[in-house]
Every structure is written in C-alpha cells, then in structure tokens.
Amino acid sequence: MKVILAEKPSVAREIAAIVGASEKQDGYLLGNDYAVTWALGHLVQLALPEAYGCVGFHREHLPILPRPFILVPKQIPEDKKGYRSDPMALKQLKIIDSLFKKCSSIIVATDAGREGELIFRYIYEYLQCQKPFQRLWISSLTEKGIKTGLANLQEGSAFDLLYASAQKRSEADWLVGINATQALSIAVGEGIYSLGRVQTPTLAMVCKRFLEHTHFQKKPFYQLRLKHQKSYTDFFSISAKIEDKKEAEALQKQLEKSPMAEVISTEKEVVKEQPPLLYDLTGLQKEANKKWNFSADETLQIAQSLYEQKYITYPRTGSKYISEDVWEEIPQLIRLLQESEAYANEAKLVKIGALNKKMVNDLKVTDHHGLLITERFPTNLTAKENTIYKMIATRLLEAVSEPCVKEVQKTLLEALHTDFLVKGVQVLQAGWRAIGGFYSDETAKDSEKDNEGDSNQVLPELVQGESIKIKAVEILSKTTQPPALYTESGLLGAMETAGKTLEDKAQRELLQGAGIGTPATRAAIIETLLKRNYIERKQKSLIPTDKGMQVYQWVKSLTIADVALTGEWESQLQKIEQGELSPDSFSSDMEAYTRSLTDTFLAMDIPQKEKLKITCPKCRNASLLLFEKVAKCPDEDCGYVLFRNVCGKPLTDELLKTLFEKGKTPLIKGMKSKSGSTFDAYICLKENGETAFEFPEKTSKKRKY
C-alpha cells in the first residue's frame, strides 16, 4: 500500500478521487492500494523554550540556543498554563503514524513549495519514519494536473536542499524571535514585546515612513500653464517650478501683455509599451489592494479558494513567467475565455495566431509559474472570488496581446526667456490596452510626479521656429508632497523590493532579487503586526500604533530592524536551496547574531514606566492586573474582567486612567459596530464596574457592551 499525504482534506479528496481511494475512514481515504491522508497544515513545530528547561523570561536563560532543535506536535495556548499539544493535531498524527507503518512507500502531496516541504519533513522526522518517499509536484489541482503529476513523480531526495532552506528559515525565526522578544521584554521590565526576524524590519519600514510623512514640511511652489490653439486644437504647455509667487505673478502679467511663444525644439518618438507579465502572488495582492481595497491576506485566501476549486493554478508563486511546455496550453485557455459570455468581447481582441510570448522564460520560473486560469471555467463564484478570477483571466489576455504602440511628442517652447514644455501622446495601436483590464497606468503616474501635466493630450503639428499664440495664462499653486503613508499595496511592494530602497549601491546589488519575506508569507507578516497591535489600518493606510512606535524607537538603530540584513538572510536561504551555501554555516552565523543581539538588548537602559494602579471597581480591594488585551482582578472570587479592545479601538493606559478616575473616557472616534458601520462615543463606567457607551448627541442614550 502507498500513502499519499496532502496538506488539506479538500486536496486529499481530489487526489483520492483520481487514484480510486473512495472508502472513507477516520482521517483518511482508502482504496485501490492507496491510503490518502492529510496534514491539517503544520501538525509539527519547533518546541517552545519550556522544552529546553527555560520556563518564563529570565536573564540567565539567554540566549537560548537549542542543539538540536526538538520537534513537538502543534502547540495551542492553555489558560494560565502556557501551551499544550493540539488534540486535533495529536489525533491526526496518530493516524498518519499508523498509515506510515503499514505502507511500502509515501507520496508527498503537500503544497509544492518551501513551507509545504517543511510540513511533510517535520512530520516524517517527528514520527521517525524511514519509508521511501516520492514528491508530487504540481501547479494545478485539475484532474489533468494531478494525473500528469502522478505519472511524473520525483524522488524525494531531489528536494533535500529545499527542505534545508525551509528548516533553516524556521530555526532562524525561532532563534531571533524567541531570544529578542524575551531580551527586550526583560529590559523593559513589564509586558511582552514581540520581535521577529521579518516582522521587525517590516514594522520599522511602516514607522519610518509614518515619521517622514508626519514631519514633512510642505513648501509651496508655482507653475505657469499656458493655453494655445493651432488647427482648431487646444493644447497646453507648462513651466518649470517657480518658488517665488511674486515672480510667477510678474511673469503672468508680462505674458498676458506679450502672448507669443516660439517653438525651440520638437521631437517625436514611437514607443512600444510591452504588455504586463502574469501576476505572481505579491503582484496580485498589490493590485487587489489598490483597486478593491482587499487586504493581502484576504486576496491570498480568495486565491487559495479558487485554486482548491480548480479554477486557477497554485497561488503562492513568486514568478511572473511560464515555461515553454506550459505555453502549449495557453491557446486553449484563450479559447475558453473567447467562448464565455463574460469574457468574449475582450478575449476576441486577442489573435490566437500571433500570441505574445514575452512571458515565456524557463530560467525565470521558480517553484511555480505565474498565475493562470485552468481549463475549468468557474460557476457560482462569490463576488470577491469573481473579482480575483477576473483579474487573473484579464491579465492573461493582456500578457499575450500585442504591445501598445504610442507616438510620444515633446516640444519645448520659449516665451520671455522662459521655457515651457509641451508633452503629448497619440495611441497608434492600442494592443494590450484595448483589453481594458486591471493594469495601472504607470506612465500617467510618472507624469504627475514630474509635474509635467497634460502628458496625454493630442497635439497638432508643431514646427521648430514657429510662433504660437498664447490664449490664456494660469498660475498653478502647488505644494511639495510628503512620502505617502504605506497602503498594503505599497508595503507589499517595499517588502518585495527591499534592496532597491537602499542608498548604498553595493547593498542594492547584493540584495537584487531578495526581499523581506516571501510571496507566501508577506500577508501573514502584515496580519501579525496588526494582531499584535503594532500597526493599524487608517482608511487605506497602515500606520503604527503607540505601542508599535515605542518598539521602533527601541530597536531602530539595531540590526534586527535593518532591511538590508533581513534581505541578505533571504538571499542566503535561496543560496541554501540552490546548493551554494552550507546550511551549517548559516546556522552558525544565526547563532552568533542571536548572541550579539541578546547581549545588546540585555544591556539596554530603558527608563521604567510608572505602573498604573487602578483599584478593582467591583470588589474595591485588589488592584487590577493590566495586560495587553484585558484588565482583570487578581481575586478569582471577584472575577472582574475588562476587555481592552472595544469595537476595534484599544483602551490605552491613558484611557483606562481617565475612565477609572473620571468615570468617562474622552470621545473615541471611529469605533466599529458588528454591522461594520463606524460611530463615535464616550465609554462610561457604571457603579458596578460595567461599562456603557454614551453618545455625544444623545447623552442619555447608553448601551451596554
């Protein structure tokens, strides 16, 4: 008997149907000499410090450097007792262990990527299994995709380096996260301040951008915009920046008296704008956030659902390209869209006999190719699923279309010894832009940044030496703009291209192709920062909370917050996967770094905050214990608890102090109701310690929460 281990029950069922394992058992499917079971994600993890005898946060325990690391079943929090093994994980591990002992060999069908490999290998090692295994490596869960994969199983040993990379990533996260968190928390003296190899530099980027935005001093500047007409066509020219308003006004008056300009030079260039490549996961997340305000995690979950329904290929991809063999399937996918009512109009603009092969590059395909639809056309999608599917389908149509051909004209005018620029664009062949898809117009964005304006206007024929009449002169009042706050789209882009933001050229070259995190993990990093109350969403922007900013102030000068160092680690993990770096060498470097980082934190002199003392409003005896998420009475007979997150807003120490001293907080704006609507209210304390809302316009209206 062969055992097939999938990552999720839904995937196991698809594979079981194809291999003929139709008999349902507890935790697996049986039949045709196959047992198909599943892992429920990470069933096995690295043990917590308690497994190494390090209970609690104590200076003398640090740094904790396990040799070797211990594997344990998935751990879940247990009230007042730390952590315990997840009963569901224990049950499924027992089932897998039983099947492994009975089988002759194993087929690994966890997700084809670094984390999927780690899920299987940790289970395999924890159960001390010695059975031979092969790898099912597929990008599509369609019947064709699974059958092709099963017919072309690869030897498990071919993925040993992928596992080594995944293992060292997991261990590095443990070393840095556990030790840095404990060391900083000890240095602060109270509370837990979580740090991480990837989350901390990401937090640093958000905080740094927020400070740059907040402290930016806007400066006014002015530009003169001239209106012209020739051959019944109106067009505009614009000056360079003028810092002095009086100078701009004086020039305006002079031009109104002498309303003529001369063409100094003019040039035309035919530009071919190549179509965009396919989406990788980060590209999809960025565009979905920009266009539809989907969070990165939401987009990933929707894409994963579409994948499991067999409508798209594997979503956690870092490539925008496809291989030559996959290219053979593209015409069939185009015809599928041409025959569908929803996509027929756009798809019929694509010429099957002249498809653009720019996205074909075997060398740039990583674990998986760029995102594609499958030959299975979707039915009964939710609105959000349909949005993501349409993005992927439309991008495919764009990617195989002809270039957009434009004639770009730049003309320089001179009036009263002042230069004025005229820019115009005429589309000669719409090409991929006729698809009308989701790709943002970077050209338009760039022209806005350059303050050149009107760059897409259609121009008449302009000849050097020609005199052009000025019909109107307008002063444009503008201000320099601060760096924009990060949206999720912007932060994903910054994480993806972390090296490109560095000023040092050598560092940029070193980190080319490396970023912070991976396409599969970036959404989770952002969600972790939100969950830990380090950042928050404000409209479409991500901004640091007071807690997040405090952590940043402590760590901003340290290497743990350094984008370059984190990017370099990602680069080293890639080298391990490619066989260019020894895993042991990476481990030694990480241990040395952990020692240094821990020593730095423990030597920090952080001023201790005066502890807030609040008498329990219920029993009136004990002082409340203040935790990040709750304030509670230590007297178990009293049992008073106040949750510190109310309708999406945290009750800070300052708000708690005001609430218990004055019986009422200041007005808190932007709280969210269960229906998702926002409201403003005061939080009031009643005599029995319970709280209620008081609304500013109807002070008599209170409701318990």
Where in this protein do the model-derived segments appear?
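Short strand-coil-strand connectors
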Residues: 30-32, 227-231, 414-418, 675
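Intrinsically disordered, low-complexity regulatory segments
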Residues: 1-170, 174, 443, 482
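Metal- or metallocofactor-binding catalytic centers and their adjacent structured scaffolds
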Residues: 244-279, 285
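Conserved short loop/turn motifs at secondary-structure junctions
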Residues: 1-3, 111-112, 189-194, 268-277, ...
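Amphipathic alpha-helical transducer elements in NTP-driven molecular machines
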Residues: 9-16, 33-36, 40, 59-62, ...
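Basic, low-complexity terminal or inter-domain segments flanking catalytic cores
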Residues: 2, 25, 82, 89, ...
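C-terminal or mid-to-C-terminal helical accessory/interaction module adjacent to the motor/catalytic core
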Residues: 88, 143-228, 268-269
